[in-house]
């Protein structure tokens, strides 16, 4: 799918709702979808899958599910955006960039650069590696949603 078609899907709240259920193990709920001339802001909420954290962290730090609030801000003119992820009830956050790059007349690639930071002495590295190891494939799966979606 080309960049204009991919951006049109991101601008469609129905696609974003569908995409939120597309990634196995990470169900996102659309909180808000704001579109103006050239800026799109998408806010989603989900729960961090317990398997994304090392076992020692699951038992030591987490007493209830970790809520994830994700904000995607897209500059539609540049086909580029930022991602911000806040983890609630866990000491961590993530942020990064996203870009839609044309690879042909009707094809494009959605790529992410994400930084994950855990604020836990001694365990931070293990948490960051574990979450990153799961987040990368989840974002890749969401990128695949662009070509898997069929307009209802």
Predicted regions and their residues:
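Hydrophobic ligand-binding cavity/cleft-lining segments
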Residues: 1-52
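Hydrophobic pocket/interface hotspot
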Residues: 6-10, 112, 146
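Short, solvent-exposed secondary-structure boundary motifs
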Residues: 16-25, 59-65, 87-93
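Short small/polar-residue motifs
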Residues: 21-31, 67-71, 94-98
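Glycine-rich portal/gate segments that line the openings of hydrophobic small-molecule binding cavities
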Residues: 30-85
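Beta-strand/loop substructures that line and gate deep hydrophobic ligand-binding cavities in soluble
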Residues: 40-42, 71-73, 79-133
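Alpha-helical membrane-targeting segments
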Residues: 51-65, 117-137
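A conserved amphipathic terminal alpha-helix motif
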Residues: 68-71, 124-152
């Amino acid at each position: 799918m080309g960049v204009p078609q991919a951006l049109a899907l991101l601008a469609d709240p129905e696609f974003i709702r569908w995409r939120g259920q597309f990634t196995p193990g990470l169900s996102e709920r659309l909180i808000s979808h704001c579109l103006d001339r050239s800026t799109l802001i998408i806010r989603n909420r989900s729960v961090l899958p317990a398997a994304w954290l090392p076992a020692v962290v699951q038992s030591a730090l987490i007493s209830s599910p970790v809520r994830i609030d994700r904000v995607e801000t897209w500059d539609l003119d540049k086909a580029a955006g930022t991602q911000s992820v806040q983890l609630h009830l866990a000491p961590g956050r993530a942020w990064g960039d996203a870009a839609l790059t044309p690879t042909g007349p009707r094809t494009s690639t959605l790529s992410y650069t994400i930084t994950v930071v855990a604020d836990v002495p001694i365990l931070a590295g293990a948490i960051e590696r574990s979450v990153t190891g799961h987040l990368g494939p989840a974002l890749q799966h969401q990128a695949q949603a662009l070509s898997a979606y069929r307009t209802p």
